[in-house]
Regions:
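Walker A/P-loop phosphate-binding motif and the immediately C-terminal alpha-helix
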Residues: 2-42, 47
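Conserved beta-strand segments of the P-loop GTPase G domain that flank and frequently precede/overlap
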Residues: 7-8, 36, 95, 143-144, ...
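P-loop/Walker-type NTP enzyme "switch/lid" segment
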Residues: 40-134, 245-247
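Beta-strand-loop-alpha "switch" segments that mediate conformational coupling across diverse proteins
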Residues: 97-98, 206-252
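Switch II (G3) loop of P-loop NTPases
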Residues: 117-122, 126-157
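Well-ordered beta-strand positions
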Residues: 141, 163-164, 233-235
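Conserved Switch II/interswitch segment of TRAFAC-class P-loop GTPases
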Residues: 148-149, 162-181
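Conserved C-terminal guanine-recognition region of P-loop GTPase G domains, centered on the G4
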Residues: 179-192
Length: 265
């Protein structure tokens, strides 16, 4: 059974980097990994994972055509938007698409209600995409990079698609306030969708090493204060300038914190 895992942050922080390193480690262990970029506003996973080719089509094209078509048969298929990663043949990437004037228009249209409308129709392009990925790639795991903030596509990825969710945060009041709302929405969705609530994990990053214990304590206090019970683990990722400067193509010994997370999947 393919496990579906989403990475989310209320403020844009660290999701794409986490996915890239986790995908790399899982692939090195022999797992087949599919990475889907739902971060329509600031897509970057295709750059970080160094795709072999890029033919200018992606998630936005797949959704947009199916939103407007009266038929399920569209010119853009899963074969057109799935690309191999240079780092490993075990990693397949479904990017958002080429960032041109057409992309901006289509992404804006999707953001203005088309995504939500998929759930009012018999045919749902989002679920169709996931099923197509499963059939074509047969991955052990699907990793989804989501938009930050509160939006339809991230909500769908978390509440309707995912078995596990990793929530990236930095322990300050902005994140705490936003995540309190998000966690309540996840809890309510468990009843609305009649499906099992996803397993919630927190990733704290990027943490200055000298302040790690203090910041972890702050998160634990927030969890206790808000009576947050439905979560599994808290992971802490140290700030590492080598990751910032070098990207993903670095020695495994440098990204140990991400390997710990990957090994839990």
């Amino acid at each position: 059974v393919t496990k579906i895992i989403s990475f989310y942050s209320f403020k844009s922080i660290g999701c794409t980097t986490a996915i890239a390193f986790i995908a790399k480690h899982l692939a090195n262990k022999g797992k087949k990994v599919a990475v889907i970029d739902f971060n329509l506003e600031s897509p970057n996973i295709s750059n970080l994972l160094s795709l072999e080719t890029f033919q200018y089509k992606g998630v936005v094209d797949y959704f947009y055509e199916r939103a407007l078509s009266l038929s399920h048969q569209c010119s853009t298929t899963i074969n057109d938007i799935c690309y191999r990663c240079n780092l490993s043949q075990n990693i397949s990437v479904i990017p958002t698409g080429d960032i041109d004037k057409y992309y901006i228009h289509r992404a804006s249209e999707l953001d203005r209600g088309l995504i939500a409308s998929f759930y009012k129709k018999d045919f749902n392009p989002i679920r169709a995409l996931i099923n197509d990925v499963k059939k074509l790639i047969k991955p052990d795991v699907i990793l989804i990079d989501t938009n930050s903030g509160i939006n339809d596509l991230s909500s769908i990825a978390i509440n309707d698609l995912s078995d596990v969710v990793y929530i990236n945060l930095f322990p300050n009041e902005i994140h705490f306030k936003g995540l309190t709302i998000i966690l309540e929405a996840i809890k309510r969705s468990k009843f609305n969708n009649k499906r099992k609530q996803p397993v919630i994990n927190f990733i704290l990053l990027p943490l200055p090493h000298m302040r790690k214990k203090k910041l972890l304590k702050k998160v634990e206090q927030w969890i206790q204060k808000n009576n947050i019970k439905d979560f599994s683990n808290i992971y802490a990722v140290d700030y590492n300038y080598e990751i910032v400067l070098s990207g993903i193509d670095i020695d495994e010994s440098i990204y140990t914190d991400y390997k710990i997370i990957a090994n839990s999947i």
